[in-house]
Amino acid sequence: MTLPFQITVPGSSANLGPGFDSVGLAVNRYLTLTVTEGSEWHFSTQSADLVGIPSGKENLVYQVAEHVASQLEKTLPPCHVQMESNIPLARGLGSSAAAIVAGIELANQLLGQPLAAEDKVRFGSLWEGHPDNIAPSVYGGLVIGTHLSTETHVIHGGVPDLDLVLLVPKEELLTKKARGILPESLSYKEAVRGSSVSNVLVAALLKENWELVGEMMVRDVFHHPYRLGLVPHLQEVIRYVKEETEAYGAALSGAGPTMLCLSPKGRGEWVQKQLQKQYPQFEVDVLKPDDQGIQVHRVLSNQQQLPIG
């Protein structure tokens, strides 16, 4: 790959309630890497969301890229990487998965593009342990997947024709903490109920039955009940969204603390205004599903960008 080039990776919202560690949706918040030649590896940023990132080989993007290269028995040339992002860290919008996917794509480009999309998802899922954020960042749109010890399977479910309204708390919530509060096991009865709800969620998503999607989002048994104490107002927001707004439903975005609301197309700003008035302590944003996934462009001398692949 000829330097310089630019990699753009969307953020994502995982789970949509009961689709735990399996369902994810790409959103139009982005991590961008601008890659140029360098005498040694160096990472820099001007983004407020990335202040304090490691500038050398301890950077997650480099660590992932180097891992991919070592698995392919290749050596990466040193580069300067300018990182910019409007994906908030530790808020449940797939910031770490976006960095992992960016590292995989960085290695892919520097090594002559040997990886297919499914290879990227496999590398990313092995690193993170599940595909619910990785796969949407690779493919864009809605993705349903499962990650096994020997293989990772994902199905692309198209791009939902929805507005996404997000309530973003000021506080961070690290995924490690949010996972640490989950139980080691569920009873057989709870597992069956959780599985059936998740099955209906996926079927409703694929049939674009948004009212039913909203009903299933609030019936999760896998993580919502255990994370209520970590996310103030979660139960109240879910009830308010369902009963007082036009949105179909709400759920934690990933591990939280951001809360995701699915809104009819074109009505997101109206829902946003209602929620901002009701919950002034949160930042309330209207987003859309990303339909592209990873994008790579060659940066020309006049700063124009030429799509690759």
UniProtKB/Swiss-Prot annotation:
Q: Does the keyword Cell membrane apply?
A: no
Query: Its Gene Ontology biological processes?
Result: threonine biosynthetic process
Q: What is its main location?
A: cytoplasm
For this protein, the record's Pfam families field holds: GHMP_kinases_C, GHMP_kinases_N
Task: Please tell me which top-level EC class this enzyme sits in.
Answer: transferase
Under PANTHER family, the record lists: HOMOSERINE KINASE (PTHR20861:SF1), HOMOSERINE/4-DIPHOSPHOCYTIDYL-2-C-METHYL-D-ERYTHRITOL KINASE (PTHR20861)
Tell me, in a sentence or two, what this protein's role is.
Catalyzes the ATP-dependent phosphorylation of L-homoserine to L-homoserine phosphate.
Q: What is this protein called?
A: Homoserine kinase
Q: Which organism is it from?
A: Halalkalibacterium halodurans (strain ATCC BAA-125 / DSM 18197 / FERM 7344 / JCM 9153 / C-125) (Bacillus halodurans)
Q: What does the organism's lineage look like at the top?
A: Bacteria, Bacillati, Bacillota, Bacilli, Bacillales
